[in-house]
Structures are given as C-alpha cells and as structure tokens.
Amino acid sequence: MTTNRLQVSLPGLDLKNPIIPASGCFGFGQEYAKYYDLDLLGSIMIKATTLEPRFGNPTPRVAETPAGMLNAIGLQNPGLEVVLAEKLPWLEREYPNLPIIANVAGFSKQEYAAVSHGISKATNVKAIELNISCPNVDHCNHGLLIGQDPDLAYDVVKAAVEASEVPVYVKLTPSVTDIVTVAKAAEDAGASGLTMINTLVGMRFDLKTRKPILANGTGGMSGPAVFPVALKLIRQVAQTTDLPIIGMGGVDSAEAALEMYLAGASAIGVGTANFTNPYACPDIIENLPKVMDKYGISSLEELRQEVKESLR
C-alpha cells in the first residue's frame, strides 16, 4: 500500500515515488551510491551535460549563506562523449530499473539539439531536463538570457524537442518579470513538462579582502531560503498550464515536499539538502507516508488531482 500511494506517472516517467535528486547536487550518482541503494529513489537528475567537456568557473565556487548556499560551478562536466561512454552505462549496469533524467545545457540552439539527440539514445534516459536558466555560464550569460526571453526559449526548446527521442522538461529560472510567459513558450514549443525553480542569483563579500567570496562574483542561491519563492512561482505557473511540474527549491523534508504538491507540483526535486545530509532523499521518502497519514492524504495522485481541480 505504501508503494502505491507514492507512485507518480509523468510523461516518460513511471516513478515508484516522487523524490528525485536535483541536477548539480548529486553528480552522476556514484558519490551517493556509497551511502545508500539508489533504487530507493524515484529517479535521478544527473549533472548537466554539454557537447564538449567544461572545467567550470575558477575557485572559490561555493559559499554558505543563511539557510542556504551560493554556487558558481559553471557547468563543469566531462562532456557528452564521456557521459554516454562511462557515466550512463555505470548507472544502467548498477541500477537497471532506475529511470534517469538527463540535464542538457548548451550555448546555441544547435548545441542543445545535438546534446538532446545524443543523450536521449541512452536506454536508461527516460526524459531530458533542458537547462535554459543557469546563471553562471559565460558567453554573455547566455543560459540566463534564453530563460528570460520567451522567443529564445521557444526556439531552443523546439530544437531540443525535435531532436530528442524522449520527453523534454524545461527548467525555468525565477529571474524573470513574468515566468508564466516563458512557461507558455516552452509549452507551445512542445515541452512535456517543467522543472522549477532554478537558483536565484546572489553574492556574498569577504570583509577582509573586501571582494566577493565567489571568484565568479555572483552565484546561484539555493536551499531553504528560496522555498517560499519556489512555492509562489510554482503555484503561479500551475494556474496557467496543465504541464506537469517537477517542483524544487529548498525542499528538505516530507512536509516541504507536500507543500510543493499543494502549490501544484507533480513530483519533487531535492537539491541542497543532499549536501547537508547525504541521506536527505531516502529520509524524505521514508517519512512521506507518516506525514501523509497525519494530514489525511491517502495518495499523492489523489492529492495532485485535488490540487489540479482547485486551480481551475
């Protein structure tokens, strides 16, 4: 009964539970496999993959903030070829039944399409998360500009959707005046779902050096501090589209996960909490049925339908 009440079905994804480690906070799964059986998870969003290898931004790239953290990693990754030859085969060999969501990033419409096409051919990749909202990449902050401009977003999403062999979920940035317009552009371009929110943009200063702590200057802010912002934006988008939303942004407990459902999410991404507690995801999964019992929630699917009806 516990298994059934946590099950989630989304385009391309039939999940035993809704808890998914967020991209950038879980590597390619190998680090956390030392702590627990990854088959406990609903899915994994692997680290962002670009066409060519990226070394990322100069250090320091991480800074602590009250109730959260800043990061300016800069999409460090080994590139598509290595991900296809090493990272995804390892996951398929060790966890053949675990559906993978591949995070795809790029610097042009053509690159997004090429990476989406290549990575979607991996048999364990069941969906793509299209990163059009990373705030830390050079090239005129191109990723952020795509996520802010509905026309650019439409073009990139359409190219990725046409190139991919699996459903495409679009990751939305909160750094926009009207997030609904970008969400609708993604929907019109053929996206199967949305993930939100990506990090806010922030910075910290070192009082001794009088300079920013991060070498990049600014970084993406995540953690519990952004949770209320995520809830508000998810609710705003859920009121205007029927696309399923994988909600993320500060989730660190079963209670927070259920709040995401009340906002309009259909599954849950867990990010920064993995750094403070490597068992964050299995802990949330274990606690979900207890918290659901406490608040009279029989199943997540029933809750999702109840919220969906209330938003109409």
Curated annotation (Swiss-Prot):
Coiled-coil segments on the chain, per record: none
Record note on cofactor: Binds 1 FMN per subunit.
UniProt xrefs under CDD domains: DHOD_1B_like
Cellular component, GO, one term: cytoplasm
Localization (cell): Cytoplasm
Catalyzed reaction equations: (S)-dihydroorotate + NAD(+) = orotate + NADH + H(+)
A Pfam family matched in the record: DHO_dh
InterPro entries: Aldolase_TIM, DHO_dehydrogenase, DHOD_1B, Dihydroorotate_DH_1, Dihydroorotate_DH_1_2, Dihydroorotate_DH_cat, Dihydroorotate_DH_CS, Dihydroorotate_DH_I
Superkingdom in the source lineage: Bacteria
Cofactors: FMN
Single GO biological process annotation from the record: 'de novo' UMP biosynthetic process
Listed EC numbers: 1.3.1.14
Gene Ontology terms, MF aspect: dihydroorotate dehydrogenase (NAD+) activity
Record pathway: Pyrimidine metabolism; UMP biosynthesis via de novo pathway; orotate from (S)-dihydroorotate (NAD(+) route): step 1/1
Function: Catalyzes the conversion of dihydroorotate to orotate with NAD(+) as electron acceptor.
Quaternary structure annotation from Swiss-Prot or TrEMBL: Heterotetramer of 2 PyrK and 2 PyrD type B subunits.
HAMAP family: DHO_dh_type1
Family indicated by similarity: Belongs to the dihydroorotate dehydrogenase family. Type 1 subfamily.
Protein name, per record: Dihydroorotate dehydrogenase B (NAD(+)), catalytic subunit
